[in-house]
Amino acid sequence: MLPSKRPSDAAAGDENGRGGDARGPGSGRRRARAAAGAVTAAPQEIDEDLHSRQLAVYGRETMRRLFASDVLVSGLNGLGAEIAKNLALAGVKSVTIHDVKTVKMWDLSGNFFLSEDDIGKNRAAACVAKLQELNNAVLISALTEELTTEHLSKFQAVVFTDIDLDKAYEFDDYCHNHQPPISFIKSEVCGLFGSVFCDFGPKFTVLDVDGEDPHTGIIASISNDNPALISCVDDERLEFQDGDLVVFSEVHGMTELNDGKPRKVKNARPFSFSIEEDTSNFGIYVKGGIVTQVKEPKVLCFKALRDAMTDPGEVLLSDFSKFERPPVLHLAFQALDKFKKDHGRCPAAGCEEDAHSFLKIAAAINEASADRKLDTIDEKLFRQFASGSRAVLNPMAAMFGGIVGQEVVKACSGKFHPLNQFFYFDSVESLPTYPLEPQDLKPSNNRYDAQVSVFGSKLQKKMEEANTFVVGSGALGCEFLKNLALMGVSCSSKGKLTITDDDIIEKSNLSRQFLFRDWNIGQAKSTVAATAASAINPSLHIDALQNRACPDTENVFHDTFWEGLDVVINALDNVNARMYMDMRCLYFQKPLLESGTLGAKCNIQMVIPHLTENYGASRDPPEKQAPMCTVHSFPHNIDHCLTWARSEFEGLLEKTPNEVNSFLSNPAQYAAAMRKAGDAQARELLERVSECLNKDRCSTFDDCISWARLKFEDYFSNRVKQLTFTFPEDAATSMGAPFWSAPKRFPRALQFSAADQSHLNFIMSASILRAESFGVAIPEWAKDTSKLADVVNKIAVPTFEPKQGVNIVTDEKASNLSSTSVDDVAVIEDLLAKLQEYAKMLLPGFQMKPIQFEKDDDTNFHMDLISGLANMRARNYSIPEVDKLKAKFIAGRIIPAIATSTAMATGLVCLELYKVIAGEHPVEDYRNTFANLALPLFSMAEPVPPKVMKHKETSWTVWDRWSVQGNLTLAELLQWFADKGLTAYSISCGTSLLYNNMFARHKDRLTKKVVDIAREVAKVDVPEYRRHLDIGVACEDEDENDVDIPLVSVYFR
């Protein structure tokens, strides 16, 4: 099952940030340290602008643990570079990179920090300065001497990517027995094969096994039974599972359950469950109650490496079509270590002698493996392993860099469940379908030698000549550009990589979009990313555009552009953009490589012409929206309160000022539009404009404070008093049931107090933003709560009396809360007349300033007001309040995101890219993947083939388009279908009907050219660059059965 298509990475939109120290030229970057010494730093405050998307995944406590963690990464091949990059972006306290080897041309295939100028330098020393650029808040140092156990004691976690087994045993023994234990990770990438081993010590506590919020339920009833049956409201399915622990709160009647004691769930069902508790003698349940899952820490006992090698236990599977693969790869990696020990090198690519020697070693180890002995050794697989074992391929490094980077985060924080303990992966399906000759695998002393040693020079040439389109240059886009540059995609004069993104760089982008720096803020994402990718590989032939890929830009991304493409890679952050790109790839029959992330989760989907279904073939169910009446009158969770708060913010500060300006800009036109509408919504708009220009008009900052204070009274006191007057606590429905039954919560009016800091904070943010919208000067004392209190306490607040007959919407299906009145037209006329008078009292040229919600600026008071609105409303309804950061996540609709899942997703996509560019791969070679690094879980599956439709001997899928050549008349087109045994009874172009055999007058069109009818009827203007007209045709066969045929293109030019 693929994850939701909604969440995704943001390539062309709202992205993560980085901040802290300025890192522009002259910002005083730290110099790389030549050796690892003790690193000390004062406790850091979390830069919430920088880490907002990461905070949404990890939370503050995990981030604080990361900020206190020192990590060693040993082995700066491509994998080591990826791991170090992800840790620097995550924001650990320090990263020490270690290597004793020097840079060779071979390394440039996998390590994006290196260039040809670095050849001959120490690998760690060559990387340290560029690694430091990623995050100045992380202390980066290089260690270039031989590593000993004494070096390890200062680290919380150590990672090795280039170490022999004997040395790994020595270091792991030291880390395993150290007090406290040092988390040890060993990972290797050998061609298209990879491994990870984790040892976090004899006892390691996982504080949060999955990172999900505790599941909750709203109780509808509880039985007095043994065991007790709890039924919940049927608004949402329960997520509890048997064995979960839950606690109860707010239960009326059966108050014994409110003791905070965790109780075990049994017989979990969609809307009910039982608990291991005898409630026979408890009080009778009356109403209310919330049940909440208790997440308990989990203690894991890791084995040391030398013990785990002989008894690896159950190994996590990534691909269920390779159920027997883990023990095979466990043997292969052991054989490789022995081969390197015997020969001092890896097996040579395509060398039969080395492959034979490798097989002999593997057979000997297997014979000595006792009860773990394999029945047979897959010689073909072992030869493939040996041949590519020296190569650290960039896609594999990116994928494993994401996995290992996440394991380090787990080791340092206890957040998420670690690997237990081995993980193996291979992608041999990425190899070309044709045989690879030894001559084709030989190095030629260029930066692609490692990749050539696996795939051969023929595929390398095809990759360099590929015409590639990357849509979006955010987090996914940056990773893709790095990967493509290292792989050599579009890196010849015959190839071209086009990247487009209409977004600019913001501070909140930088913590995952690693090609950007502080000094790039405000610049176009695509051009900065393209420049950075060209620095990684100067041969990259890239064109950066700032156009959104959408119907409005089809003159830019025209037919000729699309027809020349070899592959399209999506790096988008919203479903609508994905659907559009899917439609275009279907139309032009181009492969689409799709991916997305949501926190620690990621998914990739391959859309291959004629082999797989398209992206749009499977749609997620629409997100459940809370009914309008729930949000506005009956909230029962903080999400409802925040939805209401954002709606009020936009109404008060953006929509109403825009309405005011529309009226003032052209009163006559505005009045005509309101009269034409003549409904309750028009009346309400005019009422708000009228209030802004008269009763609520602000000329001084004191006016703004007064407005804010009266708004507080209206929102959190008067409205609640009216609601509870209309529906008192003992109110009943028309069926006689209690009106205030779950999930409704009975509200209480708030009494304003200047001694309550949250009340004053609301007044402060509301008055400052009101002043901004009216262009009123904001005094320096506006942020002084004591002076603010003095002003507020002098404001006279009218006494509120609830009214009879007020209509409050309770219908959950209602989509509009406006109440229609027979007097609407008369009221509109009266309001328009008053507005004309109010306008005369304004200064000439007066306009309000609409304020558009911006969540990522903590100095603009937007989130202060929204969180204030939401929390005061939550207080009305006894709903737990949230801090401003949590409010920002929910109200700002922030997509949780981390660098590790992004890196992994792009690595997986690029492993599929090898198959796409090579061509001739069957559908069973491709993989769609869903992964959750938090669990961890990897689920790979073959893509679903497209649905095949048939008529007689003709078959087609969604990928097909019927082409009709020639500038045909309508009669000739109808005959073209008749020749296929089909009757075309209706022909349309866009939304216009060109022909229907039921309409007699349409017979007059039979002699006209189809394109001329389209120009006349549909007002189609076919651009010069397009040679054809697309039409939709409804057909039936001889038996009058409808036949769903593909899109038809008439090539008239």
Swiss-Prot record:
One of its GO terms (molecular function) is ubiquitin activating enzyme activity. It catalyses: ATP + ubiquitin + [E1 ubiquitin-activating enzyme]-L-cysteine = AMP + diphosphate + S-ubiquitinyl-[E1 ubiquitin-activating enzyme]-L-cysteine. Keywords: ATP-binding, Ligase, Nucleotide-binding, Repeat, Ubl conjugation pathway. Its EC number is 6.2.1.45. It is an enzyme of class 6 (ligase). ATP binds at residues 475, 501, 512, 525, 573-574. Residues 59-608 are annotated as: 2 approximate repeats. GO terms for cellular component: cytoplasm; nucleus. Pathway: Protein modification; protein ubiquitination. GO terms for biological process: DNA damage response; protein ubiquitination; ubiquitin-dependent protein catabolic process. PROSITE patterns: UBIQUITIN_ACTIVAT_1, UBIQUITIN_ACTIVAT_2. Sequence repeats lie at residues 59-197, 456-608. It comes from the Eukaryota. Residues 1-40 are annotated as: Disordered. The active site is at 629 (glycyl thioester intermediate). NCBIfam families: Ube1. Activates ubiquitin by first adenylating its C-terminal glycine residue with ATP, and thereafter linking this residue to the side chain of a cysteine residue in E1, yielding a ubiquitin-E1 thioester and free AMP. There are two active sites within the E1 molecule, allowing it to accommodate two ubiquitin moieties at a time, with a new ubiquitin forming an adenylate intermediate as the previous one is transferred to the thiol site. There are multiple genes encoding E1 in wheat. Belongs to the ubiquitin-activating E1 family. Monomer. This is Ubiquitin-activating enzyme E1 3. It comes from Triticum aestivum.
